[in-house]
């Protein structure tokens, strides 16, 4: 009987700890209107870097520091990937991309509420989220509860890992950056 009580106590302790952790992450998300950050993105072992601004709900603007000077823009409905050098432009419905989960706080919070996080390397909390026939792994710092990155697949089933740093929350931003780029 004492073993049973000890097991129940330990399980309860972990449930309370994870519940508190999830509440901290959800609280931070609810307080966040926008965030800007630098990123390193790995696709098929090739690294790219740049900077992004996310504004909730559903908007993102990213510039890549690469030869093609790629930009990614979402106005909340569509996602455009544009190569500034060549002028090539690809447009996708945002709801058909895994980014919809990251960019829609309501979806993100509702999923985190019902999921249990996995602890990765005793440093990160990971939530594996499925929505709209897409999957995304989202990572938070275990101590600060800050978003630190995500992992997903692109339309060609390439694994994409994005690590973010130098995060700034609730900055004043120019909303014109979320206007979709026009064709050249």
What are these regions (language model features)?
Residues 27-47:
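A short, Trp-centered hydrophobic/proline-enriched beta-strand micro-motif
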Residues 17-19:
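Boundary at the C-terminal end of the N-terminal hydrophobic targeting segment
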Residues 110-184:
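Gly/Pro-enriched, hydrophobic low-complexity segments
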Residues 4-13:
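Sec-dependent N-terminal signal peptides
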Residues 85-124, 129:
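Flexible, surface-exposed loop/linker segments and immediately adjacent secondary-structure boundaries
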Residues 52-101, 160:
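An acidic-aromatic
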Residues 43-45, 85-87, 156:
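Solvent-exposed strand-loop boundary residues in beta-sheet-rich modules
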Residues 31, 53-59, 74-78, 121, ...:
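Short, solvent-exposed coil/turn segments at beta-strand boundaries
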């Amino acid at each position: 009987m004492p073993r049973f009580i000890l097991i129940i106590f330990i399980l309860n302790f972990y449930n309370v700890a994870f519940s508190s952790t999830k509440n901290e992450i959800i609280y931070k998300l609810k307080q966040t209107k926008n965030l800007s950050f630098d990123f390193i993105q790995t696709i098929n072992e090739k690294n790219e870097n740049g900077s992004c601004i996310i504004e909730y709900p559903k908007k993102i603007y990213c510039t890549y520091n690469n030869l093609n000077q790629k930009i990614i823009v979402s106005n909340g409905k569509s996602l455009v990937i544009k190569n500034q050098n060549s002028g090539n432009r690809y447009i996708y419905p945002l709801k058909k991309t895994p980014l919809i989960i990251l960019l829609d706080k309501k979806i993100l919070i509702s999923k985190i509420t019902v999921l249990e996080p996995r602890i990765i390397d005793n440093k990160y909390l990971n939530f594996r989220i499925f929505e709209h026939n897409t999957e995304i792994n989202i990572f938070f710092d275990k101590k600060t509860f800050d978003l630190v990155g995500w992992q997903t697949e692109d339309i060609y089933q390439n694994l994409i890992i994005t690590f973010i740093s130098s995060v700034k929350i609730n900055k004043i931003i120019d909303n014109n950056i979320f206007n979709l780029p026009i064709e050249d």
